[in-house]
Structures are given as C-alpha cells and as structure tokens.
Amino acid sequence: MDNSRKPGVIAFVCAMPMELRPLVRKLSLHKSQIGDLRVRAGTLGGHQLVAIVTGMGTRLAKTETGRLLDAVGVQRVVVVGITGAVDNTTPIGTLVLPEVVVDSVSGVEYRPAPFGGGSPHGKMWTTDLLLTDTDEVAGLRARGVVSLDMETAAVAEVCEGRGIPWSVFRAISDRATDGSIDEEIFHLSHRDGTPNGPAVARYLLRHPALIPRMVRLGRGVTRAAETAAAAAVRACSQP
C-alpha cells in the first residue's frame, strides 16, 4: 500500500478474524503490509480503506490501534464487530449504535462521532472480564448499559488522544446471562481471536450434549458479524 500517508483513509478495527471476514468479502479488501503491520486494504467511493485485527481485550486493542495510527494517516476509525446483550430479549443480530462507550476500569465515557445515520442509544460497557452474574449485569442495565464488549473504549482512548474521530458498529452475538457463554467456552479462543482447535475438540468430547448449543452460538456470532459489517459498509458508502 504505497499511499498510506494520504488523507481520507478510513480504518476498520476488528478484534477477531471472524469480525474482519465479512468486511473483506463485502469490500474486496486485499492483503497488504505497511512496514511490519499486516493489514487488509482497498477503496470505496474515493476513500482508501485499511483494516486490522487487534486481538481480544483492551491491551491488544490499544497497542494495535496505536501502531495503525502511527503507520497510516487516518481520517476516521471505525470499530466493527460483535457485542453481548445485557438482557435475554434482544434478538441475536441486533445492531448496536451506542451513544456512549464506557471504560469499566477508569469510568471514562467516550462518545462516538456520528457516521452514516442511525439512532444511537444506550451505553456500551468495555471490560476485559467475562460478565455473567445476573445481579452484576442487572446493575449495569439499570445504569443504561445495553451491551458489553472488550475493546471499544480502548480504541476510543487512542483515537481521542490523537484527535481522530471514531465510530462503532457492533451487533448482538450472545446474551450475558442466558448461559450461552461461560469461562470454559470463553477460553476456547486464543487472545488473537482465533479458535483454539485442541481445546475445542476436548470440550466437545467432554460435553457432546452441548454441540447444538455451540452450533447456535456460532451461528449467532456469524449473524452479528455480518450485520455489523453491513452497517459499517453502508455508512462508508454514503456521501
């Protein structure tokens, strides 16, 4: 990618490869490299596009977003991916456009820049912890939290520190308190978001009755990733 310092670049930031995959397909992004940074790149409506996978959690999100912004002259950062619901009624695949993203550790609130229309509402809660306790999640819901994620506030912190507008498109892939995800399932992925194949195989051998649940979870994740990517592409396509 030989024009990484030109203005007008839109950067997509995903935590996991499965969140990036729909963007690659919808935007025909190709593999590229900027220095030692591996990216996907393309164009849309006169904009240069670049996309990265950071890995899961706030530390990796902050580090990799910083590396991207060091390497590329970015006009806007767009976070794209999945998020967990804090109730048991929100349909899987529902698009979440938060008014505010909260860092669960510092309490700092970040406001996404408007991008592509939509009606933002509620708070997204960024935490490195897997939250499944019913009372804890109910407390967050009472404070206006509508979904949980593990990276967005960290990306926002880096962007705002550099004066770069950022937006977020996430969609519901699971529900925090319905039993679909627990610590064991959570750790079936590496921190870079790729599946831990041996761990998955061992889990399914120990719990064959849970295979249908895992299939449903996988379908929900795929649906959410597709929804979030489609919304991000629509926003980028608008004049």
Regions found by a protein language model. Give the residues of each.
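Glycine-rich phosphate- or other oxyanion-binding loops that anchor nucleotides, phosphorylated ligands
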Residues: P7-V9, I34-P239
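N-terminal short leaders/motifs
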Residues: M1-P7
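Structured catalytic cores of enzymes that bind and process phosphorylated ligands/cofactors
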Residues: D2, C14, R40-L44
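N-terminal glycine-/serine-/threonine-rich phosphate-binding loop
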Residues: K26-D36
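Short, conserved "active-site rim" segments that organize catalytic pockets and cofactor/ligand binding
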Residues: P7-L27, L95
